[in-house]
């Protein structure tokens, strides 16, 4: 197979795709059956065939693996036909194909901006479909970039918003980062159209693309053609402007990153006191840079001002909460600002989880992770000397780490503690929230209220009702990772735990396991309360 003949008239398109995918070996194409994604599918399959052929020869070019997926919204009565069309096109090219069905009833309830919501549902489905090591490809092109920039201009965006889309970007989805590639972003719609006709490709037409009630369609159908008629190079110029804005933003971050990083700790909390002396412009840059670490892009002036005035400058005891983006909230604790998942604003007081089989794993609510329990017999000498073996302290057998919430091997041990085992007549449960009366901690003479204990251990108010409280019957044994009560202490209750041989002691080991995302939130406030 001669490479010159292979690329022939379409060198630019192939070159753009190769440059974008060359570092990746596992590709998932978002395939709608439209012209743009059909062109990309055709180019990818030809490149795959070419690379596979080269490997059989003397070339060191590595092949790649390709899958395609169609997202079935169910909003259009032609959706089944489109899905079947995509299936046939992929069969013809020997490309593995999968259909993802979205519950369209969720979309039909939306009263406004269904265009944006449908796009969000689609991306969520696509990211969920990714296998480990796979990257997602979409067929966005230069015309799509122009629409994106004009929409950002309509919203009053700054350079970050006007930078539009990028060819290669990391997206945050749930707790994970996924790679998104747009190989055709520097190619015009005309170039793709000419390729499609020249290769005699077949595709489907979505009639909703001409519905000018949607902003993007309005720009595509009525506005941009006028600009192009007046200024034929309009699309290229806008694309260049987006590139310049992106370079300006990258340069700004590069110049300021060292000083900004000194304000942000390893858990991405922002030490905001120095910002009091900053100008409004510099302060907004810092806040925007900080939010970008959570993939909260293009925050408005209003949002940045609200973070500063309503959260950072709020009274110490106000416990202000501000929604940031779609999935996060902003909160303050002492001299730092924190970005937290939205579900951490809800109270867990009503939760009571019976732990019927104490040697089994128990799953905590609100994605807080899981708790494991294990009965151990430890040499009494080692226990006295506080020399509990490392294997007992920070390691778990695989049987205690079932995958939960679709995590992919990123669980981390947040805390390990050793308590007395329950007696036969004691039922074990996990609860959350506030406890009345005085609590007597191990190795403490006087009792204290729970609120005072939280303050002593520097546990933020928004974290307190997310700490699992371990009970035997109605008796608090431990706030996992924070403290152990007298009733749960191995030392206080030692005489009841020593084995008959007088050389060993029976302990109950409790381990709190979390995903990496929540581990980073909790780890500064939770400890190994050993015994």
Curated annotation (Swiss-Prot):
GO CC term, one of those recorded: cytoplasm
Gene (UniProt): tilS
Entry's free-text remark on domains: The N-terminal region contains the highly conserved SGGXDS motif, predicted to be a P-loop motif involved in ATP binding.
Record keyword Signal present: no
Catalyzed reaction equations: cytidine(34) in tRNA(Ile2) + L-lysine + ATP = lysidine(34) in tRNA(Ile2) + AMP + diphosphate + H(+)
HAMAP family assigned: tRNA_Ile_lys_synt
Name of this chain's protein: tRNA(Ile)-lysidine synthase
Biological process annotations from GO: tRNA modification
